[in-house]
Amino acid sequence: MEYNPFHNGHLYHLTSARELVRPDYTIAVMSGNFCQRGEPAVIDKFARAEIALRMGIDVVLELPVVFATQDAGGFAFGAVSVLDATGVVTDVVFGSESNDIGFLQRVAQILYEQPDEYQKFLHEELKKGYSFPNARKYALMRYFSMKGWNEEEVLRLEKSNDILGVEYIHSALKIGSNIRFHTIKRVGAEEKDTSFRGRFSSATAIRNLIREERWEEVRDSLPEDSFEILMREINEGRGPVFLENMGDFLLSFFRLKNMEFFERIHGFSEGLEKRFHICARQTGSYQDFLECVKAKRFTFSRIRRLALFSVFEVNKEFVEKSNAKGPQYIRILGFTEKGRKILSLMRKKAKLPIVTNMSLYRKVLEKTDLPVDKQLFFEQIDLDVRTTNFYSMFFPAVEQRCGERDFSIHPIFLRTET
């Protein structure tokens, strides 16, 4: 989840998931300060974790930045890996447009098994110049048509939440997880819908409302506790944070770099390093830069992710290793009184070391006897810390911009049982 911000659709998802599964506890794995679309969260991860706890989540875990800022496949792999590593998660419920878990499982099985016909179609679509996500979508459509699936089923692959659901299941297959997956129908506006649609407006629309300071409409779109904490963060100068706040810095940074620098960064291929190098010098605003780099095969989300990978100097080897070995720790952002009980069980069953107090993360690694890649552990945590330090520089209030928030802020503890 991203909870950027936590809106009425998220509350509907949480309530429906509880009714469907009847869990003893609820655990959410949440992006930190940067999200899958290559943008900063509108308020920081600690405030968003607090909202999630108030809304009924028992434990909030952080999805390491290296996964939170990848495409749907990398995002899902990181999230499922973290949940599986807790040793206590039995069921995962996600929202989807189709609400058809059987369909999503069939698609995931194809991606896992990689049949020859599908691989042939994928190669052909990539040669046409499509981005990988689109090439894969069209290859799957051709494969399903060949197998006699009806057109309505095939068109489901156009929907972003169905795609992400497929990736969750695919990731579980890859790591051999026994987690059971369920889906509920997504309600409200499409994610990319930028218009206010009442109580169930999209996260994109809500962020636009925040940007425009249309507070009554924001209030209508969020649960009361979510709105209250959002306004607290804004009034105290810790938000909102938007990509445009970072634009001048990012463009200046790109102008300082040569093409060889971009070639070392994860995700650069197909001439993108040249486009970044040239467009940074030919444009005067970050939005114009994005438009300049954009081409048929490159989505805006991919370009924004590459921009973040560049400024954080995330190299290809680090991401490849992370995607091969998965997250190397479980970071606790917050928990309730009830959640403290499941944390105790997690400490006995977890497959990865649990980091609660970031000041002690080195000691956590020293004491663990779990199979962890120590270098990767440090590299993943280092990226989380650096990106938090970067993010806080864009708080509106200068006095709030001090770094090392990962060390100065302890996990949120909500004393009232939910």
UniProtKB/Swiss-Prot annotation:
Disulfide bonds: none annotated. It catalyses: cytidine(34) in elongator tRNA(Met) + acetate + ATP = N(4)-acetylcytidine(34) in elongator tRNA(Met) + AMP + diphosphate. ATP binds at residues 95, 161, 186. It is found in: Cytoplasm. One of its GO terms (biological process) is tRNA modification. GO terms for molecular function: ATP binding; ligase activity, forming carbon-nitrogen bonds; tRNA binding. Its EC number is 6.3.4.-. The keyword tRNA-binding applies. It is an enzyme of class 6 (ligase). It holds the Pfam family HIGH_NTase1. Keywords: ATP-binding, Cytoplasm, Ligase, Nucleotide-binding, RNA-binding, tRNA processing, tRNA-binding. InterPro entries: Rossmann-like_a/b/a_fold, tRNA(Met)_cyd_acetate_ligase. One of its GO terms (cellular component) is cytoplasm. Catalyzes the formation of N(4)-acetylcytidine (ac(4)C) at the wobble position of elongator tRNA(Met), using acetate and ATP as substrates. First activates an acetate ion to form acetyladenylate (Ac-AMP) and then transfers the acetyl group to tRNA to form ac(4)C34. Belongs to the TmcAL family. This is tRNA(Met) cytidine acetate ligase. It comes from Thermotoga petrophila (strain ATCC BAA-488 / DSM 13995 / JCM 10881 / RKU-1). The lineage of its organism: Bacteria, Thermotogati, Thermotogota, Thermotogae, Thermotogales. The gene is tmcAL.
